[in-house]
């Protein structure tokens, strides 16, 4: 571990150290330390797609959906064809809707806000599904929930059938 830290400090752009440090910290559920590595990397290259994507993912895993969404949307402005960035953006909107929906005493305004987040999540998650059709374990449940809440009967029926089938490796 110390070797990875030292290597990253001395050669932050060398592609060996950054992903291994991030992987180690995330596997140990030390997202705070993983974010420290990302922040250091962004000081060296603030426009790196890899570093920004990693930041978006860590923020998402920390439950910081608004911040994750901001980073994801910045990346999507530059290139909207990266599947995982679409997934992060869609999931950030989805998570915000789910969080608001936990309150059973919803006002009309709050309900509209929730539906708005589901609506915003939809294109990103559908795009991710089209780009990564075999990643059903990532897109199926969020799309199922969105289709259900937005009363998209045809799409809901399709995803319901997909979810009832066993996953293929």
Feature-to-residue mapping (PLM):
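Short coil/linker segments at helix-helix boundaries
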Residues: 95-124
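Canonical positions in the second alpha-helix
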Residues: 6-7, 40-41, 72-75, 127-128, ...
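Short coil turns that delineate tetratricopeptide repeat
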Residues: 12-13, 46-47, 80-81, 133-134, ...
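TPR alpha-solenoid repeat register
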Residues: 17, 51, 85, 137-139
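Residue at a conserved register position within TPR or TPR-like alpha-solenoid repeats
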Residues: 25, 59, 93, 100, ...
